[in-house]
Amino acid sequence: PLLFSGKSNRKSIGEFIFGFSFLFMGLSLLKTNAPDLSRNPEMLSFVQNYTDMGFGSVILFVVIGTVLTMIVQASAATMAITLIMCANGWISFELGAALVLGENIGTTITANLAALTANTQARRAALAHLVFNVFGVIWVLCLFKPVTMGVSWFVEDIMRTADPAVAVSFKLSAFHTTFNICNVLILIWFVKLIEKTVCKIIPQREQDEEYRLRFIT
């Protein structure tokens, strides 16, 4: 009923609930229809061949997460795939965390592709998003072991999650949350620097009208 309401506020609430419901329906379909690698030993062997290369595996899975998110164009969908793979024991939590880092880069690249035909301000915002997340991935990779060990300690010892399948889901969620919160707390002090860098890379075009808020003096 909210979708057909004459009032814009109610209609917006209805559209929000409708879209949110479809998001979870899509995630449920992904989980239900995800291929079972245990029944496909060739594919499982292919995946596991690249899980024991040390830090090289971490870098590889960051790249895989980036490319996969660019193809799917939905970080929520790739996050669901990551949760399924870790919960079923196909990859470790550390490699799942690497996929999450890649997903954070991939979701910004899709925004940059969408902004190619937009105005200067939109392209600057998309580039700033990319810079923000790439910097976050770099510093987390430098502290990858301490960060993943800290998340594991929190979930296992503080939250006392016994079931491994549930624990790894909590770990990935906690890792994703920690990544974004810490990245904001670090980069909030460098907003001006990021702005200057982005404006230098993408200069103002003559045909673009400078954006101003209307009715606000």
Give each language-model segment a name.
Residues 1-2, 31, 69-106, 115-117, ...:
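Membrane-interfacial helix-loop connectors
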Residues 2-12, 115-121:
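Membrane-water interface regions at transmembrane-helix termini and the short interhelical loops
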Residues 16-67, 85:
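Helix-loop-helix hairpins and the membrane-proximal interhelical loops
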Residues 18-21, 25, 66-72, 84-88, ...:
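Transmembrane helix-bundle signature of multi-pass membrane transporters/permeases
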Residues 38-53, 57, 148-169:
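Membrane-interfacial helical/loop segments at transmembrane boundaries in membrane proteins
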Residues 43-46, 59-64, 91-100, 121-127, ...:
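The feature identifies polytopic integral membrane transport proteins across all domains of life
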Residues 104, 108-109, 130-142, 173-193, ...:
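Hydrophobic transmembrane alpha-helical segments of multi-pass transport and channel proteins
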Residues 181, 188-217:
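Non-transmembrane accessory domains of multi-pass membrane transporters/channels
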